[in-house]
Design a protein with these regions (language model features):
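Short glycine-aspartate micro-motif
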Residues: 4-10, 66-70, 105, 136-140, ...
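Glycine-rich phosphate-binding loop and adjoining helix at the ATP-binding site
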Residues: 74-135, 167-176, 283-297, 301
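Residues on a specific face of well-ordered alpha-helices
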Residues: 94, 98, 112, 181-182, ...
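ATP-binding/phosphotransfer module of carbohydrate and carboxylate kinases, centering on a glycine-rich
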Residues: 1-59, 63, 182-327
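Glycine-rich phosphate-binding loop of actin/hexokinase-like ATP-binding domains
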Residues: 126-128, 132-195, 280, 286-292
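A generic "binding-loop/recognition-motif" signal
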Residues: 14, 110-111, 143, 274
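Short, acidic Gly/Pro/Ser/Thr-rich loop/turn segments
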Residues: 16, 74-76, 144-148, 207, ...
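Short active-site-proximal "capping" loops at secondary-structure junctions
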Residues: 43-46, 72-76, 112, 275
Length: 327
């Protein structure tokens, strides 16, 4: 059984992580990450030539048969280029391939995060029934709101997964309660398009907090999303607590809408950097109740589990499985 050594990467606005992985040609053996990742500071690189020259120097003793990089930014239609969000750093598959002497594939970073979901090691289930090998929805509130669908393909070596990426985070935000309608009206005064990402990400939590302050008639403090989360979870600030309650409600509705839209009988997974930081709160919050409030389809969604992905670095794992599935 031939085994090849490949290179995968998770390139974000803050850090770029590169790691070797081993993939068998017939996929009879699960792929595995090899060694320790190389972690570089993305903002220190003004060009991809500088970045990949350092990567090549670090892995100079290794010859790669393929490479796949998950990058924080929209990949162009032909898959050949991407700009790392908030950095201006352009990455081209052809130039990276020349510098690293191997073929390079580019995918969006949430594409890789979604691919990592079926292989996550740390999961916490919130309600619903059994986790089935059926269509799965993935939501990822973090610096933005990623959204994707996982479709199973039952092959000779078990279930393989295809990621259907989307920009569902930019779908319209639909209020479901009078409170949410009031919040929406305040948000609409400051945002040309009030979408899910307007409230369901780090910056969105700040937007939601400021709108909540407007309803309370209080002045919004200059605080971070992390501080809002901390105050809300400890109940030391009633405005922050109600902000988190609203966040959980919007998240539950968005997760259920995704489940209904794609038929995610295999579960809706919540990944990204925010959920693990407020895990206990979300478990006891309106999240699950709002997920199940779907009128005639309440029984349908009641059987669908919500699963919190707690793995700290799913990007490299997802990139590895993306590369394996592309063979």
């Amino acid at each position: 059984m031939a085994v090849s050594l490949s290179l995968v990467a998770d390139i974000g606005a803050t850090n770029a992580r590169f790691q070797c992985c081993s993939i068998s040609e017939d996929l009879a053996v699960d792929p595995v990450l090899v060694g320790e990742p190389l972690v570089l500071s993305t903002p220190t690189y003004t060009t991809e030539a500088l970045l990949f020259t350092d990567v090549q120097a670090h892995f100079s003793a290794t010859r790669f048969t393929s490479a796949l990089f998950a990058v924080a930014g929209p990949v162009n239609l032909d898959g050949g280029a991407v700009e790392v969000i908030n950095t201006g750093l352009q990455i081209h598959a052809s130039e990276a391939g020349e510098l690293l002497s191997t073929a390079v594939t580019l995918v969006n970073d949430f594409h890789a995060q979604a691919m990592a979901v079926p292989f996550a090691q740390q999961i916490r289930q919130v309600g619903g029934g059994a986790v089935l090998p059926q269509v799965k929805g993935v939501l990822g509130p973090g610096s933005g709101l990623g959204m994707a669908t996982l479709v199973p393909n039952h092959g000779s070596y078990g279930v393989h997964w295809q990621v259907l990426p989307s920009e569902g985070g930019h779908a319209d935000l639909a209020p479901s309660t009078f409170l949410e309608a009031e919040l929406w009206s305040i948000l609409a005064q400051k945002h040309d398009h009030v979408c899910l990402e307007t409230v369901l990400c780090g910056a969105g939590l700040l937007n939601l907090y400021r709108a909540m302050c407007g309803l309370w008639g209080s002045e919004a403090e200059e605080i971070s999303a992390a501080e809002i989360s901390q105050r809300g979870q400890t109940m030391s600030d009633p405005v922050c607590h109600q902000t988190l309650e609203a966040f959980a409600g919007f998240l539950g509705s968005a997760a259920a809408n995704l489940a209904l839209t794609v038929g995610a009988r295999g579960g809706v997974y919540i990944s990204g950097g925010i959920a693990p930081l407020m895990l206990d709160f979300l478990v006891s919050s309106p999240l699950r109740r709002r997920f199940e409030e779907k009128g005639d389809l309440s029984d349908y969604v009641r059987e669908i589990p919500i699963l919190m992905v707690l793995d700290t670095q799913p990007g490299l794992t997802g990139a590895m499985y993306c590369l394996a599935e592309a063979r």
